Amino acid sequence: MFRYTRFEKARIIGARALQIALGAPVLVDVPEGSTPLQAAIIEFEKGIIPITVIRPS
């Protein structure tokens, strides 16, 4: 998996949690009663968040 800075990680998880909260489908099986933030963290840990980071060269 690609190595992210703590700022990139926070932005990715936060953006994905917002998407999930607004109705986007969750791409992994999460326990019943999980919050959008918990679902986003699980997706991040499994490496399947559909967000790309582009760094300047």
Curated annotation (Swiss-Prot):
GO molecular function annotation: DNA binding; DNA-directed RNA polymerase activity
Keywords: Cytoplasm, DNA-directed RNA polymerase, Nucleotidyltransferase, Transcription, Transferase
Cellular location(s): Cytoplasm
Swiss-Prot/TrEMBL GO biological process terms: transcription by RNA polymerase I; transcription by RNA polymerase II; tRNA transcription by RNA polymerase III
Enzyme Commission number(s): 2.7.7.6
GO cellular component, one term: cytoplasm
InterPro entries: DNA-dir_RNA_polK_14-18kDa_CS (IPR020708), Pol_omega/Rpo6/RPB6 (IPR006110), RPB6/omega-like_sf (IPR036161), Rpo6/Rpb6 (IPR006111)
One Pfam short name: RNA_pol_Rpb6
First-level EC class: transferase
Reactions it catalyzes: RNA(n) + a ribonucleoside 5'-triphosphate = RNA(n+1) + diphosphate
Family, similarity comment: Belongs to the archaeal Rpo6/eukaryotic RPB6 RNA polymerase subunit family.
Record's function text: DNA-dependent RNA polymerase (RNAP) catalyzes the transcription of DNA into RNA using the four ribonucleoside triphosphates as substrates.
Description of how the protein assembles with itself and partners: Part of the RNA polymerase complex.
Name under which the protein is recorded: DNA-directed RNA polymerase subunit Rpo6
Protein source organism: Thermococcus gammatolerans (strain DSM 15229 / JCM 11827 / EJ3)
Source lineage: Archaea, Methanobacteriati, Methanobacteriota, Thermococci, Thermococcales
Gene: rpo6
